[in-house]
Amino acid sequence: MEKSKGRKSVSQATVENCMENPGLELMEGGNLEQRYTQEEVTQGHSLEDGLGHSSLWSRRIFQPFTKARSFFERHAGLFRKILLGLLCLAYAAYFLAACILNFQRALALFVITCLVIFILACHFLKKFFPKEQLRCLKPLENTHLNLWAKRVFVGLSVVGLILWLALDTAQRPEQLISFAGICMFILILFACSKHHSAVCWRTVFWGLGLQFIFGILVIRTEPGFNAFQWLGDQIQIFLAYTVEGSSFVFGDTLVQNVFAFQSLPIIIFFGCVMSILYYLGLVQWVIQKVAWFLQITMGTTAAETLAVAGNIFVGMTEAPLLIRPYLADMTISEIHAVMTGGFATIAGTVLGAFISFGIDASSLISASVMAAPCALALSKLVYPEVEESKFKSKEGLKLPRGEERNILEAASNGATDAISLVANVAANLIAFLAVLAFINATLSWLGEMVDIHGLSFQVICSYVLRPMVFMMGVQWADCPLVAEIVGVKFFINEFVAYQQLSQYKNKRLSGVEEWINGEKQWISVKAEIITTFSLCGFANLSSIGITLGGLTSMIPQRKSDLCKIVVRALFTGACVSFISACMAGILYVPRGAETDCVSFLNTNFTNRTYETYVCCRELFQSTSLNGTNMPSFSGPWQDNVSSLRNLASCCDLYTSTVCA
């Protein structure tokens, strides 16, 4: 150490005196480097010996853990099955306990469990019996049914339909008007067909038949009606959770009183949920099954059927994305079917907004599902296939999966994507309502010039569309109001139309008088259902630009074909909704037990309701004035001691000639 210090001091002195000696410095540097290298080697040997001993001890300590990990890796499949079996047993115990304690309370759990079991069963059948399943999935045109058997089937179907109509309409002959309406729309569309001789009537009749059968299951049968009523109630309960998020952001006052903060957030919530379901593959699975069923029955091609089936769940611009790789190679007839499906149905995201208006959820769901086969049928009636399609078999058609990497990203993207839809809806409502107000003001001004008072766009629609609405099955007294709504939907927007329908429904439920100063204030329940079906679609003039913009961005090379058929597809989609309304008019029957008005009026006079109005009207009709004497009553009110008191209470709420 002293020598080194000495050298260091000499060297430093040399540098300080500017008398450097390169040879001395080089020799000293070499000696230092050699010494330091020998020390590093010695220290390295000792470090390696230490690390060797520690590594040996660590291997001995962690050897049991390493063996355990390798054991679990070798038997990972077995442990996964054991864990899955334990979870299934635990869920089975929970499921049985819930059903035994209160089956009505566990009904939703029961339905979800049955759906999951059905999906798993289909998955295992496809996995273990692929050949047998593919044999069953062949379209019906490939089966060996001879012409005689087909004719017998068609004949039996026609005879069955005639017998059903004869027996069913014997009690309600007004339903024949709706049947005549279906025939009228089909004849009009056939007259407008592009190729009359190329119409495949099998596709047309199968589509209408499937729509009719589904309507019977949903509207007429008690289990089907209760199932869809229950489904609609569950969707309403589910959508009500939107209030929690919107109230936190906007506050309770805005959410309860302002439309934009009450209904539009539902679109964001529903878009988030749909994105999650799409990420999980449930939406694609349902679309493929619906498309397969429509294809084997109606004989349509795979690409157009997938798009139309997808329109049940997604909108007119999202459904073509499902078949985007195949759009360029599709025939004009197939593209026409895709367009018609978009115009004839509504998106799942806006379904929640319509339900928030107070529109019957089960009717909206039924109309959306019933529109799919009818859209394919009428599309092939208006624009039959005359080209050779490349998609006669569904092999090779794959629905795209979401690009999200996890479920949280899917939820976030779904909510974010819905913002543009919310902005679009809000902007359209502002613009179209303002335009409608301007049109009404202009028409009113023009009418005043020739002493025509109260002229408006709605009044014109009520006269022009009244015969068509009557052919759907609407009572003549309700036709003016329904015709107004249908005209607003086609020329303005379906949101405005559904909002107007909800106003009429709210008036009826709140017990407003049906006629005030000669003007009808609301429509009947049957008219509400028929109107709900007739409005269930995007077939309005503003949708032409949306459809052309979406499809042109995907297949710009076929812009001329798109522009050539878009108007034809628009009117076809509108007729799909009208025929669905006719189906509802044929199948509608009043439901629910009739109100015992005598007991009802004896116990319920707290506020105005629809039942209060009906019972008071019945009491007014049963009352006879006898000059200055006490009024007399007939029917169930004749021997009722409280009839006079109930009459006085009804006169406090409503006006009638017997109240004078």
Swiss-Prot record:
Share an example GO biological-process annotation for this protein: purine nucleoside transmembrane transport
TM segment ranges:
82-102, 106-125, 150-168, 174-194, 202-222, 235-255, 262-282, 297-316, 338-357, 364-383, 425-445, 456-476, 531-551, 569-589
Which residues are modified to Phosphoserine? S46
User: GO CC: one term?
Assistant: brush border membrane
> Principal place where this protein is found?
membrane
Looking up Pfam families in the UniProt record yields: Gate, Nucleos_tra2_C, Nucleos_tra2_N
User: What is the top-level taxon of the source organism?
Assistant: Eukaryota
- Where does it live in the cell? Membrane; Apicolateral cell membrane
Signal peptide stretch: none
Which terms does the record give in the GO molecular function aspect?
purine nucleoside transmembrane transporter activity
Give the protein's biological function: Sodium-dependent and purine-selective transporter. Exhibits the transport characteristics of the nucleoside transport system cif or N1 subtype (N1/cif) (selective for purine nucleosides and uridine). Plays a critical role in specific uptake and salvage of purine nucleosides in kidney and other tissues. May contribute to regulate the transport of organic compounds in testes across the blood-testis-barrier.
- Which protein, by its recorded name, is this? Sodium/nucleoside cotransporter 2
Q: Which gene encodes it?
A: Slc28a2
